[in-house]
């Protein structure tokens, strides 16, 4: 970008600039570009003080260059330029600068840097703006540690990101896949840390329980979003609609994430069971200390464990309602306080003749046994609660 309408140095008079301008204009009109006329006394002094003049010119050019780029710089604000034209007797629309003593490479670098910033701000992918809303959309009305209830609305990014009527955007599906994989990775890390021999017992405020809650909540939002996409695809009455919409891989990723969450739930139950066993041995060894309760012990109290187990049951029920939505189920009462277990009426993998040795057969058996896994986990939680009740009675 060239810098125009600038005096190179305050020592140059308007008369010298006007003379150079007239000489250059005459050369252009005649069509012959002659050698520039001899420099005046002021111009000779400029070349003697070239470093100082170059710095002044760069400073002035940078200032005017930034001003002329403003949107408010128009003909109405060009009062200073009009007065300068009257003083010099020429038009400032012509190129009348002495380019020999100006370092244009620095101006070019500055212009490229500014254009690079503008291009960087314009090239932001608009699809990525939903990342923050997707992960924190529901967090606005849920405080940390607050649990779900049946009336809590589940918001999805469909209100911020438009989903095509016939097919989901590849960027949208990629974003959901990345978030599901992130949930699975964090869940695996939490499970590994909890299974460490020196890990602290899980409490309501521990990082393991927080990851179980946050991971389940994020997974539920993703499942609800995918359900919207699948419902729109199936409404077209096309047999290839769902298979071609690109959600098959995402569905498997979601199921893998659900398995990791179940692994974390089981690890929490195992850690609580280990703490209960230790407390039971301590109670047996010190029978004289019957008056002490778990609340006064350094280890977490039974109330802490009870709240954690109740949260796990709540999260399992939440996953049940999302995973088995629209599937014909047969309710059956289990041993845990009359909680209804959702048992699928479809045949399992063995009845379908699937090969459990293959990855597809194993995956099919895992999918058909999801409700059974949830049922067994509820039974484990119920047994732990019974052990805690017995321990408090000792």
Curated annotation (Swiss-Prot):
Recorded superkingdom: Eukaryota
Record keyword Transcription regulation present: yes
Disruption phenotype: Nearly abolishes the transcription of FMAN_15221 to FMAN_15223 under PKS8-inducing condition.
Subcellular location: Nucleus
This protein's GO CC annotations: nucleus
Keywords: Nucleus, Transcription, Transcription regulation
Protein induction: Expression is induced when NaNO(3) is used as sole nitrogen source.
Claim: Iron-sulfur is one of the keywords in the record: no
Function, in words: Transcription factor; part of the gene cluster that mediates the biosynthesis of fusamarins, isocoumarin derivatives that show moderate cytotoxicity with IC(50) values between 1 and 50 uM. Positively regulates the expression of the fumsamarins cluster genes.
Name recorded for this polypeptide: Transcription factor
Organism encoding this protein: Fusarium mangiferae (Mango malformation disease fungus)
């Amino acid at each position: 970008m060239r810098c125009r309408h600038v005096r190179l140095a305050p020592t140059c008079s308007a008369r010298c600039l006007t003379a150079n301008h007239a000489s250059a204009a005459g050369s252009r009109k005649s069509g012959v570009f002659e050698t520039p006329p001899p420099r005046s006394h002021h111009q000779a002094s400029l070349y003697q003080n070239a470093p100082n003049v170059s710095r002044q010119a760069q400073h002035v050019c940078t200032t005017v260059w930034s001003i002329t780029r403003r949107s408010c710089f128009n003909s109405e604000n060009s009062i200073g330029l009009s007065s300068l034209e009257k003083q010099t007797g020429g038009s400032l629309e012509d190129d009348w600068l002495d380019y020999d003593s100006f370092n244009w490479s620095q101006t070019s670098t500055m212009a490229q840097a500014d254009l690079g910033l503008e291009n960087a701000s314009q090239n932001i992918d608009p699809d990525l703006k939903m990342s923050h809303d997707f992960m924190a959309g529901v967090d606005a009305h849920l405080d940390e540690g607050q649990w779900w209830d049946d009336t809590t609305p589940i918001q999805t990014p469909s209100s911020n990101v438009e989903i095509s009527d016939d097919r989901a955007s590849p960027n949208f599906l990629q974003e959901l896949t990345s978030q599901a994989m992130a949930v699975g990775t964090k869940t695996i890390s939490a499970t590994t840390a909890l299974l460490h021999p020196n890990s602290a017992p899980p409490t309501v405020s521990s990082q393991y329980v927080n990851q179980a809650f946050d991971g389940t909540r994020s997974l539920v939002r993703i499942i609800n979003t995918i359900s919207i996409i699948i419902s729109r695809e199936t409404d077209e009455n096309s047999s290839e609609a769902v298979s071609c919409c690109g959600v098959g891989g995402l569905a498997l990723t979601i199921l893998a994430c659900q398995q990791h969450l179940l692994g974390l739930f089981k690890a929490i139950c195992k850690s609580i069971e280990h703490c209960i066993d230790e407390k039971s041995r301590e109670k047996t060894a010190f029978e004289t200390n019957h008056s002490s309760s778990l609340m006064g012990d350094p280890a977490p109290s039974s109330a802490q464990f009870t709240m954690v187990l109740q949260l796990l049951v709540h999260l399992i029920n939440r996953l049940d309602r999302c995973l088995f939505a629209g599937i014909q189920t047969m309710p059956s009462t289990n041993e845990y306080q009359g909680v209804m277990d959702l048992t699928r009426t479809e045949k399992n993998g063995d009845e379908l003749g699937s090969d459990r040795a293959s990855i597809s057969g194993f995956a099919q058996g895992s999918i058909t046994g999801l409700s059974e896994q949830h049922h067994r986990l509820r039974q484990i939680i119920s047994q732990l609660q019974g052990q805690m009740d017995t321990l408090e009675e000792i």
